[in-house]
Amino acid sequence: MSPQTETKTGVGFKAGVKEYKLNYYTPEYETKDTDILAAFRVTPQPGVPPEEAGAAVAAESSTGTWTTVWTDGLTSLDRYKGRCYDIEPVAGEENQFIAYVAYPLDLFEEGSVTNMFTSIVGNVFGFKALRALRLEDLRIPPAYTKTFQGPPHGIQVERDKLNKYGRPLLGCTIKPKLGLSAKNYGRAVYECLRGGLDFTKDDENVNSQPFMRWRDRFLFCAEALYKAQTETGEIKGHYLNATAGTCEEMMKRAIFARELGVPIVMHDYLTGGFTANTSLAHYCRDNGLLLHIHRAMHAVIDRQKNHGIHFRVLAKALRMSGGDHIHSGTVVGKLEGERDITLGFVDLLRDDFVEKDRSRGIYFTQDWVSLPGVLPVASGGIHVWHMPALTEIFGDDSVLQFGGGTLGHPWGNAPGAVANRVALEACVQARNEGRDLAREGNEIIREASKWSPELAAACEVWKEIKFEFEAMDTL
């Protein structure tokens, strides 16, 4: 043993296992403006005190490990360690609490959502002392936010590119999602766009399969949208899914989309990964492409109330990584989403400054310091009867996406698109005239259907369709 090692172990180091709370539970700590703050819903194993469980989360997601190590003496743990600074019981739950943890900014690489998540949630969720753990919210400080480009363009730039103002944008996912040839797929795109939609969309699992290779799909969809633009005089788009098995292949597809002159591409950001997503977002800004984001796989991560990561955290991460649209649930359709909670993370996507509001699940005040906003996309089981509620809930800065609610029209795709466009224009006009969409919505749709046979047919088909299940995502 060298003299230096002997001195270190003899004077300052004592091997063994210490309780986490001795170093990582610090209720006296005053958080700094530069700290990343996290709110964890913790369910400890029986016999584990809240202070020890909260401290364990702070330790295992920052500088700690299960035993004392002599290299602790070679750095300043007080500077780098995470701290559990507050513990709050969860109302109505016997053995569950919210642990608030502060992380020094120096723990994280600038501009890397990948590194942020690897640190905060990468290892601690498998910790045996915890029965379950859920990351409910993060406060991203301005000092860290400023290291990210964020969305390639943002809401205002997108509206300027499309020359469309004063209403939600309308979209449609092409169905069946798998099995169509590229030419038939392009035909479906054309019919929807000429009928009045702003966008059509590849579904999340449309990549480059044997029945429809990506290059063929891109070419036929570009032909369809240019033809629809010529006929309607409106700028049209189709979300060309660039998601691929490698980043290099993804970028090749995005480059080809740019060469075709189309306005927008798409990425599955969770299955594709944050590193790939951020790379694509940077390319899109540099080359004038809008970026639509699908959240495929999100429910695997966020659906369980006691374990995983809440979608509001994934939404914040997407705004940092980069995307101009992201699917956000509908409140009224077939997919998960309770109204107040959904609107909470919708505000976190769109607004520049969002106050703490626990009634909407927002644990921290969030200042985005002018990072561009993201348009929420309402999609999944919606149809013309939902239009008043969707317009009232999401407002103008949103994309309302009707897949089956367009393609399921008894007269075909173009009449289905007409029905949705007429319903939307009627709702926007009624709202601008001061009418109450929540109370008068059905009447507004019925009035409009008198002047639109396409809307009348859609109203008849979907008059009995409801998705009345209790939301899992509650406070």
UniProtKB/Swiss-Prot annotation:
PROSITE patterns reported for this sequence = RUBISCO_LARGE
GO biological-process terms attached to the record: photorespiration; reductive pentose-phosphate cycle
Which ranges are cleaved off as propeptide? 1-2
- Source superkingdom: Eukaryota
Primary localization: plastid
The protein's enzyme class: lyase
Listed EC numbers: 4.1.1.39
Localization in the cell: Plastid, Chloroplast
The family database entries (SUPFAM superfamilies) matched by this protein are listed as:
RuBisCo, C-terminal domain (SSF51649), RuBisCO, large subunit, small (N-terminal) domain (SSF54966)
- How is this chain modified after translation? The disulfide bond which can form in the large chain dimeric partners within the hexadecamer appears to be associated with oxidative stress and protein turnover.
Question: In the UniProt record, does the keyword Phosphoprotein occur?
Answer: no
Q: Which keywords does the record carry?
A: Acetylation, Calvin cycle, Carbon dioxide fixation, Chloroplast, Disulfide bond, Lyase, Magnesium, Metal-binding, Methylation, Monooxygenase, Oxidoreductase, Photorespiration, Photosynthesis, Plastid
Q: Which cofactor does it need?
A: Mg(2+)
Which amino acid positions bind substrate, per UniProt?
N123, T173, K177, R295, H327, S379
Cofactor binding, note field: Binds 1 Mg(2+) ion per subunit.
Q: Where is this site: Transition state stabilizer?
A: K334
- What's in the misc comment field? The basic functional RuBisCO is composed of a large chain homodimer in a 'head-to-tail' conformation. In form I RuBisCO this homodimer is arranged in a barrel-like tetramer with the small subunits forming a tetrameric 'cap' on each end of the 'barrel'.
Belongs to which family? Answer: Belongs to the RuBisCO large chain family. Type I subfamily.
What protein name does the entry list? Answer: Ribulose bisphosphate carboxylase large chain
